[in-house]
């Protein structure tokens, strides 16, 4: 009983701490001497790093943020926790990325970390979701729109992956991750509706 409870709590704490690693903030601070929270969109994610620092740092931040989500799930799996706790660890990583304790609870928008979580939980769903993101991005050149559409597609992708028999925890995380990503993009939605959302290559 104690070992089981300890493992569950450990997975949540590690998930949050992994997610809260401020890779974008650190990259901008070390390479450009700026506080990313005070530049552009104010997000500490890869898109704002791209606009404020450059392509190379943005790619590195993206890969690190993906790794945070995947690692959180894999740690829970290594602890032999059930699907529900693996999912919870992934969501803890998303929460850490969005609300990092180190940065006054102001972080990123959980897109890359959410992708990493999906790759850890069900890699076909993660790849399909990323494919939708890239497809929309290739036509629109708007990262936020691509992220929102990919997030909205997630529950359907999860249902299709398991042919209507998705594990309850997986279906729950699909809806939870969708809600978190869309909620974090609410200011982007306002700009999209107003026609003022910047495209790739434009400053925010």
UniProtKB/Swiss-Prot annotation:
This enzyme's EC code(s): 2.3.1.275
Function: Catalyzes the transfer of an acyl group from acyl-phosphate (acyl-PO(4)) to glycerol-3-phosphate (G3P) to form lysophosphatidic acid (LPA). This enzyme utilizes acyl-phosphate as fatty acyl donor, but not acyl-CoA or acyl-ACP.
Membrane-traversing stretches: 12-32, 85-105, 117-137, 142-162, 163-183
Domain of life of the source: Bacteria
GO biological process: phospholipid biosynthetic process
Protein name: Glycerol-3-phosphate acyltransferase
Catalytic activity, as annotated: an acyl phosphate + sn-glycerol 3-phosphate = a 1-acyl-sn-glycero-3-phosphate + phosphate
NCBIfam families: glycerol-3-phosphate 1-O-acyltransferase PlsY
Keyword set, alphabetical order: Cell inner membrane, Cell membrane, Lipid biosynthesis, Lipid metabolism, Membrane, Phospholipid biosynthesis, Phospholipid metabolism, Transferase, Transmembrane, Transmembrane helix
Enzyme class: transferase
Entries under PANTHER family matching the protein: GLYCEROL-3-PHOSPHATE ACYLTRANSFERASE-RELATED, INNER MEMBRANE PROTEIN YGIH
Location of this chain's protein in the cell: Cell inner membrane
The keyword Lipid metabolism is assigned to this record: yes
Topology in the lipid bilayer: Multi-pass membrane protein
One of the record's GO molecular function terms: acyl-phosphate glycerol-3-phosphate acyltransferase activity
Family indicated by similarity: Belongs to the PlsY family.
Hydrolase in keyword set: no
Subunit structure comment from the entry: Probably interacts with PlsX.
Pathway: Lipid metabolism; phospholipid metabolism
GO CC annotations, alphabetized: plasma membrane
Pfam families the record matches: G3P_acyltransf
